[in-house]
Amino acid sequence: IPYEKIGIDVAAARIESYDDKSRKPTEVIYTDLKGDLFRRDFTINAMAVDILPESFGELHDPFSGILDLQAKQITTPLDPDETFGEDPLRMLRAAYFASQFGFEIDKKGYDSIVRQKDRILIVSQERITAELFKILASPKPSIGLVILQETGLMKLIFPEIDIMYGIDQTPEWHHKDIFFHTMQVVDNAAKLTEKMEIRFAALVHDIAKPITRRVDQKKGYTFHGHDAIGEKMLDKVAQRMKLSNNLGTYLKKMTLLHLRPIALAKKGVTDSAVRRLMVAASDETDDLMTLCRADITTKNSKKVKKYMQNFERVDELMKNVQERD
């Protein structure tokens, strides 16, 4: 129902029953308000406000959702095994709420996600991808992404990210663990931009590092070709995750090019090198530079300052080249 500038959804109070192999209800029973709130995902969403004139504004909170809201806790009205069993997507939604609001999943719910994780496979890929987008759009995406990894959900919905966990990098340049380096890059990107596409690119930019890691006796670990191999890997990822063609192409380009500005920043910048980069990146040049800034995760403040200054030089040269061309 349209009301002023918003739309109001109207639905009858109901209880739904499910079987073990589908998230579609096998039976719908119409019920009262408490019965309807009983089937909600979390107690913080199981509250209602009366709009009848004689009791307008009265809060109905049968499961102490207000207390959980104040405690910043994600709790289910029912036993979490039942709640997550009915609609397994709620497990991803719990991770999203944790990322979006900085809340914590209560222990019973967390343990239930670990037990129920395999049921996520009955959910359509489109719904899973949409929930992942929400996590990436949150203020600190790493919170939800780490929950997915620790509970075992990441292995099921995004195995290419899961295998990053526990794989060391050369400490001089990055955090030792590729997974946690990636989490830092995603969070850095979230601070720099609200654009979900850049945040997604931050998540996948090192996707090929686990399969390209080699040992160099002088340099430690190397990941030669992880940019080009990562670009190829993203074809299958985009297809599996039902990404749009535009997003898939964008992620491939950002992954392929993400080392180019970093290389320029390390070695110094020439007009011809900048021009080649601009041609390759095309309309995504600014996005690529944002990703590269996010990719600076070293704790060495002198190196951070140096790279940032060099990126500023790259930006300035791009403007100069663009004006002359």
Language-model segments: which ranges?
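Catalytic cores of the polymerase beta-like nucleotidyltransferase superfamily
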Residues: 1-325
